[in-house]
């Protein structure tokens, strides 16, 4: 049986030393519950014959370039563990940053709106005293009038607060191209009282997403649907209107010409359908989603994308063409323009 150093060194033809070590540590943790202290202490050498055989099989698959997430059948995302399998895109850290941006924006806006409502609903002592002094000593009719006046003020304050359109306390969220369900499930768990629906064209993806929702106690639900059919169905049949507060998507956005710069294990194992777009039409999915969002978002609803940094300008202009406003781009932790948000007017 190979020791820890021999295990990670066997992967260096494909990965640098740091990445090879991280992969082997991930395997030892997921399969055998070993901590870094256990590994340094030589616990790898204490594996049984059956455990050692299984580890060798895992290393053999890794040596062929198969992603460790597919080998283990799981991937960590936003502090949770998701089931993944071939045919479903492996969740990326950058996508977790998109989820964090959405959840933080929603929760912050909800707090702002609640503060506005509290402020608007509070009647100042001066106003209250004015009302009391005006009708003090008056009869039953005057007291009734005072109550009515107070209620009218309250109603006006409520309408004024709700007119801010900052956030819905029970937001409806649609995730298009849901894959493993990582975005939909994360938002359903991180945004209280949210109603989340995910769509994907792949049966396999919908099945995996449903499995993850059950495993993680999420109420997100998933359906098979083609993004390119959705705008037309919304136009022709009112029954298909979903009316969301938030629509989010991490659609395919890598051009064929970019393949030369990609890792072999991604090209060989992850689904092309979830990754690539034609060189001549890099915004193919974004246009369909933007059109759908222009129909299905409520007024002041928000559309979020993970984007290709190479086409940030074109994506922004496309959204402006569909009437979106307040378009904002956000960099990921690697300093790339990876996320975009737009508001429906």
Where is each model-derived feature located?
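N-terminal auxiliary segments of SAM/dcSAM-dependent transferases
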Residues: 1-77
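Short, low-complexity, intrinsically disordered N-terminal peptides in bacterial proteins
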Residues: 1-9, 148, 234-237, 345
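A general structural signal for well-ordered alpha-helical segments in protein cores
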Residues: 4, 24-25, 55, 68, ...
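Alpha-helical elements of Rossmann-like donor-binding domains used by nucleotide-donor carbohydrate transfer enzymes
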Residues: 6, 10, 26, 54-57, ...
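A general structural signal marking secondary-structure boundaries and capping sites
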Residues: 31, 35, 43, 62, ...
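SAM-dependent Rossmann-like transferase core, predominantly class I methyltransferases
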Residues: 43, 56-131, 135-192, 196-211, ...
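An acidic site on a long C-lobe helix of protein kinase domains
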Residues: 51, 91-94, 285
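S-adenosylmethionine
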Residues: 190-344
């Amino acid at each position: 049986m190979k020791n820890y150093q021999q295990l990670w060194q066997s992967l260096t033809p494909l990965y640098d030393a740091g990445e090879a070590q991280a992969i082997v540590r991930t395997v030892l943790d997921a399969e055998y519950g070993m901590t870094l202290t256990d590994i340094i202490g030589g616990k790898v050498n204490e594996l049984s014959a059956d455990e050692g055989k299984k580890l060798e099989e895992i290393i053999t698959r890794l040596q062929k370039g198969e992603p460790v997430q597919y080998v283990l059948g799981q991937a960590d995302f936003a502090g949770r563990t998701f089931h993944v399998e071939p045919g479903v895109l492996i969740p990326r850290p950058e996508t977790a940053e998109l989820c964090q941006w959405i959840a933080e924006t929603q929760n912050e806006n909800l707090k702002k709106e609640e503060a506005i409502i509290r402020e608007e609903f509070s009647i100042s002592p001066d106003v209250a005293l004015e009302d009391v002094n005006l009708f003090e000593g008056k009869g039953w009719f005057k007291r009734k009038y005072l109550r009515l006046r107070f209620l009218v003020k309250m109603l006006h304050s409520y309408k004024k607060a709700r007119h801010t359109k900052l956030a819905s306390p029970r937001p409806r969220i649609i995730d298009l191209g849901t894959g493993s369900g990582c975005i939909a499930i994360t938002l359903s768990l991180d945004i209280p009282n949210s109603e989340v629906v995910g769509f994907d064209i792949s049966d396999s993806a919908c099945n995996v997403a449903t499995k993850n929702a059950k495993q993680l106690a999420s109420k997100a639900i998933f359906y098979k649907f083609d993004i390119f059919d959705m705008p037309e169905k919304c136009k022709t049949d009112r029954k298909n209107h979903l009316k969301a507060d938030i629509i989010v998507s991490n659609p395919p956005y890598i051009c064929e010409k970019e393949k030369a710069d990609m890792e072999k294990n991604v090209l060989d194992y992850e689904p092309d359908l979830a990754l690539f777009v034609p060189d001549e039409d890099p915004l193919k999915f974004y246009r369909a989603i933007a059109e759908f969002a222009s129909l299905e978002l409520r007024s002041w609803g928000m559309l979020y994308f993970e984007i290709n940094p190479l086409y940030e300008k074109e994506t922004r202009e496309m959204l402006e063409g569909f009437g979106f406003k307040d378009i904002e781009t956000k960099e990921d932790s690697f300093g790339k323009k990876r996320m975009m948000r737009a508001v429906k007017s």
